[in-house]
Regions:
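Acidic, polar-rich low-complexity tracts and alpha-helical solenoid repeat scaffolds
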Residues: 1-97
């Protein structure tokens, strides 16, 4: 959570920082926490995006959800990631109609 907080509203920097940590330390005990941070940051960035980029970023959030839930099917964050997935999916579905 420190990485996320220290970057303020710069969601992309939070994503890149967390991804770099995971790349450098793939077996860290904090892997799940860093992964939820990436998902949250992508979701928050998508929500605050300009309309032209919002749908693509929601789709990226959905992709990140699948990666997360595949790696951590019994995550302590499961209800949160399910809520994010539902919201992002609803947005994409509404955009398609």
């Amino acid at each position: 959570n420190t990485v996320y907080s220290s970057t303020g509203n710069n969601y992309q920097a939070a994503v890149v920082t967390a991804q770099n940590i995971l790349r450098e330390y793939p077996y860290t005990k904090r892997r799940e926490d860093l992964s939820i941070l990436i998902l949250r940051a992508k979701y928050d960035m998508a929500k605050e995006s300009v309309p032209e980029k919002k749908e693509d970023r929601m789709r990226e959030t959905i992709d990140e959800y699948y990666a997360f839930i595949n790696e951590f099917p019994e995550s302590k964050y499961k209800s949160e990631v399910e809520r994010i997935f539902k919201d992002a999916s609803k947005f994409v579905k509404d955009e398609e109609n």
